[in-house]
């Protein structure tokens, strides 16, 4: 879905990696939370505290999923799922965006 309706958005961004990754929290009418993020070119490692579904909304990422040794490509319109309490890496060569839904 390219449009989120009936939401509240946090004014303050979450800034990571010296400003190279930024996201905003979005609260949906049903009480659930998502984050919308922009990632500048680079390689980054993230950790999860709860399960997540990461949808690529523009551009593409290469992702090193937990317990994997092979990078996988995810482009606009695709997604991948992460369990709680895992680490994963992403890398990209151009600006890319994502929407993270929490499980």
Curated annotation (Swiss-Prot):
GO terms for molecular function: guanosine phosphorylase activity; purine-nucleoside phosphorylase activity; thymidine phosphorylase activity; uridine phosphorylase activity. Its EC number is 2.4.2.1, 2.4.2.2. SUPFAM superfamilies: RmlC-like cupins. It is an enzyme of class 2 (transferase). PANTHER family: PYRIMIDINE/PURINE NUCLEOSIDE PHOSPHORYLASE, PYRIMIDINE_PURINE NUCLEOSIDE PHOSPHORYLASE. Catalyzes the phosphorolysis of diverse nucleosides, yielding D-ribose 1-phosphate and the respective free bases. Can use uridine, adenosine, guanosine, cytidine, thymidine, inosine and xanthosine as substrates. Also catalyzes the reverse reactions. This is Pyrimidine/purine nucleoside phosphorylase. It comes from Shewanella putrefaciens (strain CN-32 / ATCC BAA-453). The gene is ppnP.
């Amino acid at each position: 879905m390219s449009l989120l309706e009936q939401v509240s958005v946090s004014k303050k961004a979450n800034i990571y990696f010296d400003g190279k990754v930024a996201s905003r929290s979005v609260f949906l009418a049903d009480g659930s939370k998502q984050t919308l993020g922009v990632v500048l070119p680079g390689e980054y490692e993230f950790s999860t505290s709860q399960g997540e579904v990461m949808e690529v909304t523009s551009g593409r990422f290469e992702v090193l999923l937990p317990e994997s040794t092979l990078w996988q490509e995810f482009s606009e319109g695709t997604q991948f799922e992460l369990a709680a309490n895992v680490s994963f890496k992403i890398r990209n060569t151009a600006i890319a965006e994502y929407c993270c839904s929490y499980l």
